[in-house]
């Protein structure tokens, strides 16, 4: 991973307010959390078939060096808008300005994550009803790549500017060796990094408990984590010193997955590199899951609803002083801005990189990506080629420096474009510095897989819950997770 000059980022920051109707390049980051928004779609049929034909748009002059896509209508399914209300407004403005500037029309399906990981998208793809371009977490694209609906990056790499691609080259080993290794190389292009496993904590709770934030935050290892959490709970003003996360959609990925990866490297993944075996029952996983469960069951540092606790609850409960420390995912950043206000601005609540348990890795990220799709079976090749070019022009917007410089505020993600990192603002809450340190130290990442959702969520989730509630031991949970994964994969 690339290095950088580690600068202290302690200055106060302005919480940017929503600017309704602002232009893309001037839009401020709206605050607030977003769930899966109700899907909405403009006129036109699915992009995979005959729908979304060209024509009907007023021709405009393209900027120098751009492809002329005026009059082209293409299908775009967009999921990233649910990161926050600010992200939704930002992206709607982005699309509107793209259409105005190019004369193309993006036939939008504004949707959320549920349809991607559930049955809706895959059923539509199988019925030849799919877009020309979509956004999603890279690890959720395996079913669509495996069905040969996604165009690999190498097939259109030459159509992206060299100077743009150069800022994303640092991610290519992660795609080639981990994410898309199953298909021989990178299939999609990342534009945003959703950070998993960072710490957030109340610095005033540390001080009231007699702890030193400069040396006790973040905790150095698992033993130190338990020690700090215990001190916060027994001597600080909060009710719970270290809140665990295990709610639906968050089961094991926020914790303890980043800890397993940091402890065991590739042994902390859920599959071997060649996908010939599941790893949930190895020593790394059993040790980490046991330590995770012990934080709640043995040390009592997490609240009574831990078995169902979601990380979206953290900002409000941390603002109220109920919990002192936890591991919220980075998209909670806009919610912290909205719900915490001055305590966030002045550094009372701060972020830090996640646990380093020996490998140097301090958490991981989900890359949010843009994917280009192949033509539908009934789509005219000439029409498809124009729609494909329009889709690539839209991808360029997501990868552009102007857009990348705004993602941290509007969506709580680290921009994937490397050259904008050093210009991220100094903040007292330290979010951007923490996320950057995590990205720079990332060594291994989960493989994309057609059955990723089952392997990462559906199989482990029930067993991690039973381990938290004490119905089964952590070791038994690991054994059952591995057994079910092997059965699913036919191993």
Please state what every model-predicted region is:
Residues 142-143, 234, 281-344, 390-407:
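Ligand-binding pocket segment of bilobal, Venus flytrap-like solute-binding proteins
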Residues 4-22:
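N-terminal secretory signal peptides and thylakoid transit peptides that target proteins
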Residues 154-174, 215-218, 242, 263-287, ...:
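Short, solvent-exposed loop/beta-turn-alpha elements that line the ligand-binding surface or hinge
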Residues 63-66, 139-198, 255, 262, ...:
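Hinge/lid segment of periplasmic solute-binding proteins
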